[in-house]
Amino acid sequence: LNPTDLQVEIKARPPGEAVALAARMVQHRPGPFLGAWAFYTLGTVAVGHLLLRVLHLHWAWVLALVPLLAPIFSLPMTTTAGHLVFSPRVAFRTVAATTIRRGAPFLLLFVANRVLTLLGLAAFVVPGLYLWRASWFLGPVVTLEGSSMEASFRRGRRFAIGFHGHVFGHAFNAAMLLVYLTIAFTSLAHFLVAKVFGQTFTALAELPLQDGYYAYITLVGFALAAPFVTLVWFFVYLDVRIRKEGWDLEIAFRSRAAKMEQGHA
């Protein structure tokens, strides 16, 4: 297929289509995705535990800061998705090699972005919101655009920041859904633990989770959901970029999937 012959209209993919496409991607190569998912989830829980037990922050502050800090563990997830789109035989070693090679610029950009974002939001200035919206694209930009910090920053300005207004609605919808599901999961778990199991198992009161376990349950719920939201957001970003260049993400995926099925035949 010649990209110039497609003449694809440049518009964002609806959230439902992005979720369905992400689910099909995961079904083709579940191993690398599950590994990246576990890395993201365990890293997020570790950060929350550090804030709660080492820095002794109130759980409300922890739940507010974790969404800002957790995406530092997202690079393996976006790397897996990027490799799967362009190379259907993505393996653990490929994802690990790319993550290590591009980890340094990602970390430097992540720290700088979060510091500036917090300063901007603390001062209630527009650049804080601007950087927060642009930071959604940090993982995909570093994953796809190069390993050097200079190249990532230069191309990130061209692709990511230029597109953030176009697909900001997807990020907002995903964030609201994530918050809703987290609250629903937390409320249900709190009811079951406190009202049902607490009446049956007297040893439950002696568990260390009893002290602040509500925060831990919320944290785990977020840590389990965040990788999938990141994955869907990556496909939204990638869809916009591919359409900008005349391609369509669905066509590219079907082509790669067909090649992979032929290879297994």
Where are these regions (language model features)?
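Hydrophobic alpha-helical membrane segments
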Residues: L1-A265
